[in-house]
Amino acid sequence: MSTSKSSKVRIRNFIGRIFSPSDKDKDRDDEMKPSSSAMDISQPYNTVHRVHVGYDGQKFSGLPQPWMDILLRDISLADQKKDPNAVVTALKFYAQSMKENEKTKFMTTNSVFTNSDDDDVDVQLTGQVTEHLRNLQCSNGSATSPSTSVSASSSSARPLTNGNNHLSTASSTDTSLSLSERNNVPSPAPVPYSESAPQLKTFTGETPKLHPRSPFPPQPPVLPQRSKTASAVATTTTNPTTSNGAPPPVPGSKGPPVPPKPSHLKIASSTVSSGCSSPQQYSSARSVGNSLSNGSVVSTTSSDGDVQLSNKENSNDKSVGDKNGNTTTNKTTVEPPPPEEPPVRVRASHREKLSDSEVLNQLREIVNPSNPLGKYEMKKQIGVGASGTVFVANVAGSTDVVAVKRMAFKTQPKKEMLLTEIKVMKQYRHPNLVNYIESYLVDADDLWVVMDYLEGGNLTDVVVKTELDEGQIAAVLQECLKALHFLHRHSIVHRDIKSDNVLLGMNGEVKLTDMGFCAQIQPGSKRDTVVGTPYWMSPEILNKKQYNYKVDIWSLGIMALEMIDGEPPYLRETPLKAIYLIAQNGKPEIKQRDRLSSEFNNFLDKCLVVDPDQRADTTELLAHPFLKKAKPLSSLIPYIRAVREK
C-alpha cells in the first residue's frame, strides 16, 4: 500500500515538473513583464452614478438624501400615498427649477420666432430659493449629489404601481462642473414677500374711503419673495442655454454627414426611462430615435473589391444526373452589383444663428443713430439686474417721462434673442401693452432701450394692500383681455400672466409688460417648453404636455383669484408642495364663491377649466356678461394713489 502511494507521489511530481516553468523560465518571464508603474490603473473619470428611485406603495425609496429631506419636509407621507403621480410630477418640475440662478428678464427672451433656445427651461423661482443653492453641499458625495436627475413617467403614462415604476437618477463627478451645478440642492422654504412700495410725493387731494385688505394672520415664513417693481419695466427671467450635438452616424453609410439635430429635438438619452430631469435642468427629456432602419445588413470585403450581400444570394441551380441515377446540384453564384446606398433622411435644419458681428450690424439698422444723451435726462434708477439697469428719464423739451434700460451689449449672453425681441416689440404695439419707443447703440456697446413708463407700479401692490370690488376687477381683466386678444391674434403667447406683470398708470391705465416669456406659434400648433411662474401655471404646462394660447387664459383666472384673495392659490405653501397641489387638484378652490356674483363665478369657471380644449378664449371672455360690470378705469386711481403714498 505504501509502495502504491509513493509511486503516485513520484508520478505527480514528475508531471508537475513537466508542466511547471523552471526557475529560469520564471526569471525570463519576470524580465518580460512591464514595470508595476506601467500597469497602474488610473482612477475613473467622468463617472456617472445611477440610482433607481421607486415607490413601494408606502414611500419613495432610492432618492438622494437632500431630495428625501425636501420631500418629507414639504409633502407628508399621507399626501405621498394619496397621489404618488402628483409627487413625481412635483419632483420633476421642482428639480428642473434648479437649472440656474434667476437673471434679469427684461429684454432677454425666448424668441417669438423659430429659435433653438426656445425649448430650454425658463421657469422663475424666487431669489431666496436660488440663493440657497450656492450655499448647500451634499455630504454623501457624488452618489447623493443634488445634481442627481429625477426621472419618471410623464403625466400621460400609466399610474405608479408597487415595485414596477422607477425614476432614474444620475449624478456626475466630472471635476469640470461649476460649483453652481454641483450644489443645486433643494432649498429651504422661501421668506415672506415684502409689501413695501417706493414712496412718491404725498397726495393732498381728497381720497374716497378705501377698503384695505385685512392683515394676514401670523404664518411661518414660507411665502416666496415678490419682485419689487417700482415702475414699469424692471422684471426678471432666466436665460436659457442649450448644447449642440450631432446624432450618431448611420451604420454602413458613406453618404454626407448628418447635420446637427436642432437642440429642441436633442436630448441626453443616457437612460431608458421616459424622461430625465435634474436639479440643473428645467426641461423635460424626450426620447428621440436617431437610427435609421435600412432593411438588410451590408458587408464589404476589401480583398477583391467585391461587395457581397450578407443575407441575399442570387443563384442558378442546375440538376445533373450521374451514372447511378443520382442527382447533384451545382450552384452558380452570380455576384450582384454593388447596392445603392440608402438616402440619408435629414431633418430640415433651422437657420444658422447669427454671429455677434451680424447681430451688431442688424442692430445698427434698427437703432436711432443719434446720441441719446441730448434727448433723455436720467432722473433716478428704478431697477437693476444682471443684464442692465433701468432708469426713469425725462424727454428733453417736454413733460414726457419714459423708462430707459441701459445694457452692455457685448456682455449679453443672448444677443440674437435680444435683437429679435426688439424687432418684435417694434412691430407689435397696443394701448394695453408696455410699448417700445426707440433704441440707441452708443459706442457699439451701450445699448439704450426706451419703453413706456407707468408710475403707478404693478398690480401686486394694489391687490395686496387694498380690496377691489367686482367692478374694478372686471375693469382690470377687461384691459388685460384686450392685450391678450391682440397677442393671440398674432399667434403670440405671453406665458407669464400675473399681477406682477400688470402695470398701472396714475391715470388708471392698465398694461401688460414683461414680454420675456413670449413665444410665437403657428396657428393650430402647440408648444411643450416649461415656462412661467409655478403658482400661476396651467396644469398642461406643469404636466409638461403640449399647450397653446389657452395657458394665458388659465393664468388670467388665477390672477382674478389673486385680486379676490390678495394672493394666488397655494402661495403660502412651499414651491414643491404648491406644484404637488396643482398637479393633484387641477382647478383650485374658489374660497369666496358664496360672496361672488353668479357672473363672476361663471367667468372664473370658464378660465379655470383643466382641459384646455374646453377652456374659453379671449373672444368668448371679452363678450362675457361679467365684463359688463366693469367700472371706468378712473375708479382705480384712488387705490393706486393710496398705495403709492404708503
Swiss-Prot record:
Skewed-composition ranges (Basic and acidic residues) = 22-33
Q: Which Enzyme Commission number(s) are listed?
A: 2.7.11.1
Q: Where is the composition biased (Polar residues)?
A: 196-205
Q: According to its UniProt record, which reaction does this protein catalyse?
A: L-seryl-[protein] + ATP = O-phospho-L-seryl-[protein] + ADP + H(+); L-threonyl-[protein] + ATP = O-phospho-L-threonyl-[protein] + ADP + H(+)
Name the phenotypic consequences of knocking out this gene: Isoforms a and c: Partial sensitivity to the heavy metal Cu(2+), which is characterized by a failure of larvae to reach adulthood. Partial reduction in basal kgb-1 phosphorylation and after Cu(2+) treatment. Several DD and DC motoneuron axons fail to reach the dorsal cord. RNAi-mediated knockdown causes a similar phenotype but less severe. In max-2 and pak-1 double mutants, defect in axonal guidance is more severe. Animals are also uncoordinated, defective in egg laying and in distal tip cell (DTC) migration, morphology and guidance, and exhibit ventral enclosure defects.
Necessary cofactors: Mg(2+)
Keyword Chloroplast applies: no
Q: How does it assemble?
A: Interacts with mlk-1; the interaction is independent of max-2 and mlk-1 kinase activities. Interacts with mig-2 (GTP-bound form).
In Swiss-Prot or TrEMBL terms, this protein is called Serine/threonine-protein kinase max-2
Q: Which organism does this record belong to?
A: Caenorhabditis elegans
Q: Gene name, please?
A: max-2
